[in-house]
Amino acid sequence: MKRKIVSAVLLLCISIVVWAQEPILKLRYEENYTPTYYEVIEMYRLLDEHYENAKLTESGMTDIGKPLHTFIINSEPEFDVQKIKAQGKSVLLINNGIHPGEPEGIDASLQFADDILRDKNGMRKWLDNTVIVIIPVYNVGGHLNRSAYNRANQATPYETGFRGNAKNLDLNRDFTKCDSKNALSFNRIFQQWDPDVFLDTHTTNGSDHQYSITWITPFPDYFPPTQEEFLRKQMIPDIFEKMDAGEYKLTPYVNWIFHDPAAGILLWQDAPRYSSGFASLFNSYGMMTENHVYKHFPDRVKSCYQFITTLADFTSENSTEIIASRRQGTEEMLAMKNYPLTYEVDTTQYTTFTFEGYETSTEVIDKVTGLPRFGYDRSKPYSKEIRYYYSYNTVEEIKIPEYYILPQAWTKVIERLKLNGVIYRTLEEDQILEVEVDYIDEYDSAKRPYNGHYFHNNISTHKEVQEIQYYAGDLLIPVRQEKMKYLLEMLEPKAMDSFFRWNFFDSVLDQREYFSPYGFEENALKYLNDHPEFKKEFEAKRAADQEFAKDHRAQLAYIYDNTEWAEKTFKRYPVARIY
């Protein structure tokens, strides 16, 4: 009798083990179907209920009024980030659905979560060294705006969400300016988890080729020497090698030079407005996958899944080195004297690789218009050695200040600094400080709004040292802190995605006081008589410049702009430096 009971118990245990290995989720990407927002969240809720080492949490709000979720997968039922970090585990953060018309990552991450939790092919061992955090759908509003007509260049899946969010923002331009609640929530999530590796999943239709998936690698030149070396010698080549051993080969993102990949492609430089560029501000290894829109949806999902599993494997296998490289990178960053602001590709530095593409022609006859166009001939695939330009040179760099001073009036900037964990102190009393300031000499603004802003380009400045009145409560920000790159990229006006470029300081570009020629005449005359050296300079300009000599207002303006009457705050950038 006892033997029968034991046998029954063993049989029950075996049945449970076998049952536990079965997938929980029923995904339908093979049918060219991607789940709705509610279906996605329900699937993660099922995994949460089934596995004690997985947890679905609400991690902030989105513009559509629905929460932004994170799904945490650990080796044990521990979800406190500080306790996890104390165990020495690396963190892999995966973001999906930023452009819901590009849903491969949504399906692939669901498949990955289901498989790693049921330990398919021994995947669960990766959790020994790495905790995985998944954002199921980032652009919730866009994913709810579902239609069969949101992606004109994309045949499958049959219905997808929309690129814009509830405020019609492209959220992959919003990570630093944070116009959306989505981005504010993401910034909090990112600072909470401080991911060692970050992946954002996308789809591209920029070119046609034989690959189902392309990769925007971390931009090595953004990183301190130890991390740059780790990227170039280990992470990037290892992931390419692991991917090429699988069903779906990987190619660098096809950032072409002359419209045809055969002419060579460039390493993509991702600005901080993009998720991967934002990650690099904190020395996190940020990257994007770009699935190829013209491939069948099932292949896009499976190739994205292959990349996610490859990345999880690499992150776990190299967890200790990844964490150590970031720590060393921070030390190297804090020792820097100068900081690069702008880059250009180094055309002398390239490697070659075999690219699998299609022959191109500028004489393809359009079936609708009957006119010639550029196109690819899929009946003529090729494998060619092409150049890959992988290195950039610094064009402009700045001396790193010891402190920034930011007046408390600029609350929107301060909110974003706080959100990203910037350390600062406030002045305890009113005081005059000698500081270096920038004056904005020239800039171009977009003629039409770009993601809700009139972005500034072609900025030129000059520096002055001035004594400026500051007040109790103004911010004194030490630059040499863990958030140094974020500070430099956001507060230096000429940095590629600075707060200045995104119009946070535009009110300083307006002049508040003016002169009336009639009212200013007597004051101008008295000033010239009281300042003979300036009078000589003024008369010399009038003698040398005939147009100036004929222009009544221009002459008075010259006196106004070059004397004590001029507004010192006009075009004076509010963030000052102390060295």
Regions found by a protein language model. Name each.
Residues 7-17:
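Bacterial N-terminal signal peptides
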Residues 2, 20-579:
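Structured catalytic-domain cores with a bias toward divalent-metal coordination
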